[in-house]
């Protein structure tokens, strides 16, 4: 990884060891970035609760080396430097959106910094189809045949589903 250069790098920030104002420090770097919701429910393979942490992804405009990414991560108390192969996939990982065996975190709690747009990052055609497939599967598993019910469920529990339902040209009414 020493010689690799990419536009997207990631790290983990542990609440207990990061500066208390680490998000402000990150904002002061003026680098587009995403900060995951606080991961405070993750478990190890043996069921032990992991240390509370955040995932941080930097979205540079140009190729950067591991040393350049590390320089930013050290300012915020980041542990490790991870080369991100697929920006969209890692963005989804911030909330475990494609990992049903892991705790699902709310995509609305992702912090977007310096012009990065998390909602736009997730809003792709394949993602829309994946979400619609999830909704259909959920409806089948839970015997749901009311569009109004699934729309309200999504509004209250799954913002990613709610956006797709609203943006996909579907319509509901109480009549």
Segments the model singles out, each with a brief description of its role:
Residues 1-10, 14-23, 27, 63-175:
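Catalytic "initiation/cleavage/transfer" segments centered on a nucleophilic residue
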Residues 2-4, 48-51:
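Short, flexible turn/loop "capping" segments at secondary-structure junctions
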Residues 10, 31-32, 58:
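Intrinsically disordered, low-complexity segments enriched in glycine/proline and serine/threonine
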Residues 27-28, 52:
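N-terminal start-of-chain detector that recognizes signal peptides
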Residues 30-48:
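Short, glycine- and small/hydrophobic-rich beta-strand elements in well-ordered beta-sheets
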Residues 39, 60-62:
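Short glycine-rich, polar/acidic loop-and-turn segments at beta strand-coil junctions
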Residues 51-53, 66:
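Amphipathic alpha-helical transducer elements in NTP-driven molecular machines
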Residues 54-60:
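Conserved RNP beta-strands of RNA recognition motif
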């Amino acid at each position: 990884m020493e010689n690799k250069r990419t536009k997207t790098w990631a790290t983990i920030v542990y609440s207990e060891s990061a500066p208390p104002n680490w998000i402000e420090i990150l904002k002061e770097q003026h680098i587009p970035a995403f900060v995951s919701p606080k991961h405070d429910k993750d478990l190890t393979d043996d069921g032990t609760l992991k240390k509370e942490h955040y995932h941080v992804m930097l979205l540079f405009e140009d190729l950067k080396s591991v040393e350049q990414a590390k320089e930013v991560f050290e300012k915020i108390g980041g542990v490790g430097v991870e080369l991100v192969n697929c920006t969209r996939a890692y963005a989804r990982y911030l909330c475990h959106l494609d990992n049903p065996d892991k705790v699902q975190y709310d995509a609305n709690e992702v912090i977007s910094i310096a012009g990065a747009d998390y909602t736009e990052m997730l809003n792709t055609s394949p993602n829309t189809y994946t979400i619609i497939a999830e909704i259909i599967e959920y409806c089948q598993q839970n015997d749901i045949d009311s569009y109004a019910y699934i729309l309200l469920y999504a509004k209250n529990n799954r913002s990613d589903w709610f956006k797709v339902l609203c943006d996909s040209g579907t319509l509901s009414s109480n009549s």
